[in-house]
Regions:
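A donor-sugar binding/catalytic signature common to diverse glycosyltransferases
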Residues: 1, 12, 16, 210-256
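Secretory-pathway glycan-assembly enzymes, especially type II membrane glycosyltransferases
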Residues: 1-119, 123-130, 136
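Anion (oxyanion) recognition and catalysis
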Residues: 2, 6, 169, 236
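Short, solvent-exposed loop/turn segments at secondary-structure junctions
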Residues: 18-21, 32, 138-142, 181-183, ...
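Leloir-type glycosyltransferase catalytic cores
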Residues: 36-83, 255-316
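Conserved catalytic-core segment of nucleotide-activated headgroup transferases in glycan assembly
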Residues: 86-192
Length: 316
């Protein structure tokens, strides 16, 4: 797409879910995530702090998961209904939508139990003052995994983290793996992780949860491991030592551990919060739009913000 646009004298701007959550979406010139042109130089953001005002708080958009699910069902239904008219269309999703819905439905039926289990794990961690690291999973078909990471799958990322943790993390620490809230459940990551943990002799040091209050878990964690999830920004907000195993917009000295994963467990340091605030303010002002893709109110807010952003880019 970019070469075609360039050949015709057109600039490309890309929409994506927000880097900053909640209440924001991303609109960025050229590309997003691993294709973002945001600098990775800490000194650059510190210098920009002099001319960048504090980022405004996002106003609630009215977003809810049911609205998102409604649009997804309409989208999947249209794909199925009109499939014969577009025989060459290929989705980025690996499975038929309604097959994925079966997995989501099964997971939804177990959601109350998932919340009880995660609450029990959280109490177990906090009541005992247990040292632990948190590893939030991402979606297996997400371009963040498929394109912008060194892994072919989430299972491969789990294997990398568990193997390193077993050999190099403090012996008294635990690893908490938190599944993605929108995971379909068609790949049993819990079974995969627990089986590998047994093989590595660390089964008693692993906790896998399908729910849980992420801010609480981050607030008490010794550190966080992500591939390149937006949870990384949340970890920085909570002043947690962080390593990003893939390409991330926040992957720079002062925000993330720049050494190996093996060394992270013992030697990682808390982020530079002045740098984090400088980075966050710049990102909000230059890449984020207050709004969402799914609700009437959120779309109206996003449209107005996008028009202002694009008009400003036109006159720049």
């Amino acid at each position: 797409m970019h070469p075609i646009a360039q050949a015709n004298g057109l600039r490309v701007h890309v929409f994506e879910e927000g880097y900053v959550r909640p209440h924001w979406l991303t609109l960025e010139k050229h590309g997003v995530n691993g294709r973002s042109q945001l600098p990775r130089d800490p000194a650059w953001y510190r210098d920009q702090r002099r001319v960048t005002p504090p980022g405004p708080p996002g106003q609630p958009t009215g977003y809810n998961l049911y609205e998102r699910a409604f649009h997804d069902i309409r989208y999947r239904g249209a794909n199925t209904f009109f499939a014969t008219r577009f025989p060459h269309y290929r989705s980025h999703r690996p499975r038929n939508g309604f097959f994925e819905y079966s997995g989501l439905a099964a997971r939804a039926l177990r959601q109350r139990q998932h919340h009880r289990d995660s609450d029990q794990v959280t109490r177990e961690l906090l009541d005992a003052g247990r040292a632990y690291y948190i590893f939030p999973l991402q979606l297996n078909s997400d371009a963040q995994i498929v394109v912008h990471s060194p892994f072919d799958s989430v299972r491969e990322a789990i294997a990398k983290v568990l193997t390193s943790f077993a050999s190099h993390a403090p012996a008294d620490s635990w690893l908490v793996i938190k599944n993605h809230p929108l995971d379909t459940g068609l790949i049993d990551y819990r079974r995969h992780a627990e089986q590998l943990a047994r093989e590595l002799g660390m089964a008693e040091r692993l906790r896998f949860i399908d729910a849980g209050h992420l801010p609480t878990l981050l607030d008490h964690a010794r550190g966080a491991v992500v591939v390149n999830s937006t949870v990384g920004l949340s970890a920085l907000h909570h002043r947690r030592p962080l390593i990003a195993l893939g390409t991330a917009i926040y992957g720079m000295p002062g925000l993330t551990w720049q050494g190996s994963l093996d060394d992270f467990w013992l030697h990682a340091e808390a982020p530079d919060m002045h740098l984090y605030q400088a980075f966050l303010d710049y990102v909000v002002h230059h890449t984020q739009i207050n709004g969402d893709f799914y609700t009437r109110s959120g779309i109206a807010m996003a449209t107005a913000g996008a028009v202002r952003r694009l008009e400003a880019a036109t006159h720049a």
